Amino acid sequence: MARIPESDWKFLTNHALVLSWITQHPQTTARETAIAIGITERTALKIIGELDASGYITRRRRGRRNVYRVNPNLPMREETQKNVMVGDLLGVIAPKRAKRNVA
């Protein structure tokens, strides 16, 4: 099999990676998310805020932590992917927990 050369591009955006991580780790912190994905904590907080503001996740306080729930019934944001629901993507990239941590 031919080796794929190293480069900086990825198939999934940081937003998709954060959403996938939250699906699998609903009590995660922004710091834990950032470390797992390889982004800064500030970037993780920004992405979590954007996902929350757009309705893709909801946050609920439990003690000193947030617990996240994912809304799988919203469409992808890309114009060419509006017929694909976020839950469909999560079923592929986070299959083990996708069904348990959804609204």
Q: What is the predicted role of each segment?
A:
Residues 46, 50:
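Alpha-helical DNA-recognition elements
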Residues 42:
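Key DNA-contact positions within bacterial/archaeal DNA-binding proteins
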Residues 9, 22-25:
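Short helix-capping/hinge SLiMs at alpha-helix to coil transitions
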Residues 1, 75-103:
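Amphipathic alpha-helical dimerization/coiled-coil segments
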Residues 52-62:
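A short, conserved structural fragment
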Residues 32-35, 52-53:
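Alpha-helical residues within the helix-turn-helix
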Residues 4-15, 29, 61-84:
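Short, cationic-aromatic polyanion-contact patches
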Residues 16-21:
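Pre-recognition alpha-helix immediately N-terminal to the DNA-recognition helix
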